[in-house]
Design a protein with these regions (language model features):
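Active-site neighborhood of phospho(di)ester-bond hydrolases with catalytic His/Asp-centered motifs
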Residues: 1-4, 31
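Surface-exposed intrinsically disordered loops and tails
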Residues: 9-23, 40-48, 71-78, 123-147, ...
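Extracellular S/T/G-rich loop segment that most often corresponds to the catalytic His/Ser-adjacent loop
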Residues: 18-98, 102, 106
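Residue-level detector of functionally special positions within alpha-helical transmembrane segments
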Residues: 4, 85-87, 151, 156
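Conserved nucleotide-binding/hydrolysis micro-motifs of P-loop NTPases
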Residues: 6-8, 36-37
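Basic, gly/Ser/Thr/Pro-rich low-complexity segments located predominantly at protein N termini
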Residues: 9, 90, 100, 156-158
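C-terminal subdomain of the subtilisin-like protease fold in secreted/lumenal serine endopeptidases
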Residues: 28-30, 102-205
Length: 206
């Protein structure tokens, strides 16, 4: 589900659906759009697209500018053209999920989604934060936390090959069914759970 292209601090209502029906959250992925930055190897959130906002816990970001894709013209004739929008970003995330589901064929979709979320990246090639990672209020989220503009960050298939980065709930994985040794070398933290609890507690007190 895409966040939308309306320059808003929150996603379009369809991407924000789990806010109103929390049971849907585990089945949801929202996608925001990125573009290349002015420096080589840098990326930034596209400012006239909707941000993660209140949907940040199920949002990731992906390239959504200058994407060469199949299209149709006003008469329905097929062709190819360069397009921009969160609809161009979403297929990147669907592809990332497909790769990770192939890698972890004994996991269910929720577990694979959690791997994608908790191994997402928000760094440029030089190690600096992508523009748009900093929260609206100026808070710079640390590694493993979730931004109210970019969500979890950008799916990182390299890191995603080595297991989850955090456990967001009960997580069972049957190694015997996997059929062979499976090495998970990512450090496991709980910083996102701590962040969410702190934010939920603050909201309840407000």
């Amino acid at each position: 589900m895409t966040t939308g292209n309306r320059d808003m601090k929150n996603p379009y209502y369809r991407a924000l659906y789990p806010l109103y029906n929390p049971a849907a959250e585990k089945h949801w992925i929202a996608v925001a759009g990125l573009k290349k930055g002015s420096k080589a190897g840098s990326y930034e959130l596209i400012k006239n697209f909707n941000e993660a906002g209140q949907g940040k816990w199920w949002t990731v970001a992906a390239p959504g500018n200058g994407i060469y894709s199949s299209t149709t013209d006003d008469h329905g004739n097929p062709g190819y053209a360069s397009w921009g929008g969160t609809s161009m970003a979403a297929p990147h995330v669907a592809g990332a999920m497909g790769v990770l589901m192939s890698r972890y064929d004994q996991m269910n979709a929720l577990q694979v989604r959690d791997v994608m979320f908790t191994t997402a990246n928000h760094k440029n090639a030089d190690g600096t934060n992508m523009e748009g990672w900093t929260d609206v209020d100026g808070t710079v989220r640390k590694d493993g936390e979730v931004s109210d503009r970019m969500g979890w960050g950008v799916p990182d298939l390299d890191k995603g090959m080595y297991g989850p980065g955090q456990f967001l709930g009960k997580f069972e994985y049957n190694m015997a069914k996997a059929g062979s040794l499976d090495v998970w070398s990512n450090d496991i933290s709980n910083v996102a759970l701590d962040q969410r609890k702190a934010e939920d507690d603050a909201w309840m007190k407000a």
